Amino acid sequence: MTQKIKCALIGPGNIGTDLLYKLKRSPFLEPVWMIGIDPESEGLKRAAEMGLKTCATGVDGFLPHVLEDNVQIAFDATSAYVHAENSRKLNALGVLMIDLTPAAIGPFCVPPVNLKEHVGRREMNVNMVTCGGQATIPMVAAVSRVQPVAYGEIVATVSSKSAGPGTRKNIDEFTRTTAGAVEKVGGAKKGKAIIIINPAEPPLVMRDTVHCLTETAPDQAAITESIHAMIKEVQKYVPGYRLVNGPVFDGNRVSVYMEVTGLGDFLPTYAGNLDIMTAAGARTAEMFAEEMIKGTLKLEPVHA
């Protein structure tokens, strides 16, 4: 039995619960705590049934247990508003934060684009952008690694049922954080992000549209090849990531139309937006965990 790094999940909503299912399968990570703020929460009850310790008094109620249970990684799936405080308190105890909110106080991580850059940087907080960011930024990066992109615009459409209260409270943060990461990680000089929450019944699968304006006439063959190579990289951890149409070339505009089907861990397969976020978060944490198990990464407390 290989050693596993113990983890805590903060926020027992759609994202936190879906992530829990994925961590249960991880060869490097062992989820041991689920932290919420409502003792009646379905997510906390479900986590307890799955054998986790639970706490309904927020991060403050969990702090005394961090060191005794040797928790080294925490995933925050709450809300951008509370993430900074959660991170400060846990970083002070030497816990690495994987931020699944749009708070973006740490550097962005989109695994197929820049995961390897985070190795050896000794960061104690990394941000997973947003579900829309994880689904679309690889496509912007696939174009920008071929030639300069003056403008990148992404539209993420998710089903109403998959967007919980935390997601809805963070719409403005979603658009700002995603647009920022389209620039910083995707490589576009200017980025824009739009989210659409679709109430259709039965719920629709996540769909994503990506438009890039290249500075010069697009090299169609090279861009097409780059996009297909990037899709294969994303499919390594999100098998339901699929090209529906494109790349479509119109002058200097390159358009790509994607859909993301989930594994159906917590919500049914239409909720690909949960999968792409939680799988990316788990993949990122596993990379840090592998380093920790090998002994090449030792977490140090950070005092703000």
From Swiss-Prot:
Catalyzed reaction equations: acetaldehyde + NAD(+) + CoA = acetyl-CoA + NADH + H(+)
CDD domains in UniProt: ALDH_C
SMART domains per record: Semialdhyde_dh (SM00859)
Keyword field contains tRNA processing: no
Biological process annotations from GO: catabolic process
Catalytic residues of the enzyme: 131 (acyl-thioester intermediate)
Residues where NAD(+) binds: 162-170, 273
Origin: domain of life: Bacteria
EC number: 1.2.1.10
Gene3D superfamilies: Dihydrodipicolinate Reductase, domain 2, NAD(P)-binding Rossmann-like Domain
Short name of one Pfam family: AcetDehyd-dimer
Keyword terms of this UniProt record: Aromatic hydrocarbons catabolism, NAD, Oxidoreductase
Gene Ontology MF: a single term: acetaldehyde dehydrogenase (acetylating) activity
UniProt family annotation: Belongs to the acetaldehyde dehydrogenase family.
Name of the protein this chain belongs to: Acetaldehyde dehydrogenase 4
Organism: Dechloromonas aromatica (strain RCB)
Source taxonomy: Bacteria, Pseudomonadati, Pseudomonadota, Betaproteobacteria, Rhodocyclales
